[in-house]
């Protein structure tokens, strides 16, 4: 059912969060942040590194790169 499908952004963020995949986040001002995503909602992402948490607003994010290859494709069309 189309209503049950998750959007790509949420699927990606949930995958790296559940797998505790290290990510690099580039902000629109060029700042690079690294850590593990522990939580997210429609407006922000919580990034954890070395026991410290950073709340990053999504409107400030340019790119999120996982530290390892990931596959979101589950074989369904």
Curated annotation (Swiss-Prot):
Q: Which domain of life is it from?
A: Bacteria
Alphabetized UniProt keyword annotations: RNA-binding, Stress response
Record's keyword annotation contains rRNA processing: no
Q: Boundaries of each Sm domain copy?
A: 10-70
User: GO molecular-function annotation terms?
Assistant: RNA binding
UniProt keyword RNA-binding present: yes
Annotated SUPFAM superfamilies:
Sm-like ribonucleoproteins
What's a single GO CC term here?
Answer: cytosol
> What biological-process terms (Gene Ontology) are attached?
regulation of DNA-templated transcription; regulation of RNA stability; regulation of translation, ncRNA-mediated
This molecule's function is given as: RNA chaperone that binds small regulatory RNA (sRNAs) and mRNAs to facilitate mRNA translational regulation in response to envelope stress, environmental stress and changes in metabolite concentrations. Also binds with high specificity to tRNAs.
Hey, which family's this protein in? Belongs to the Hfq family.
Quaternary structure (record):
Homohexamer.
| Official protein name in the record | RNA-binding protein Hfq
> What gene does this protein come from?
hfq
């Amino acid at each position: 059912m189309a209503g049950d499908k998750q959007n790509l952004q949420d699927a990606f963020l949930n995958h790296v969060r559940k797998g505790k995949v290290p990510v690099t986040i580039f902000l629109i001002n060029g700042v690079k942040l690294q850590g593990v995503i522990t939580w997210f909602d429609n407006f922000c992402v919580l990034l954890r590194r070395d026991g410290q948490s950073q709340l990053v607003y999504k409107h400030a994010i340019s790119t999120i790169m996982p530290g390892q290859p990931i596959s979101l494709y589950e074989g369904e069309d």
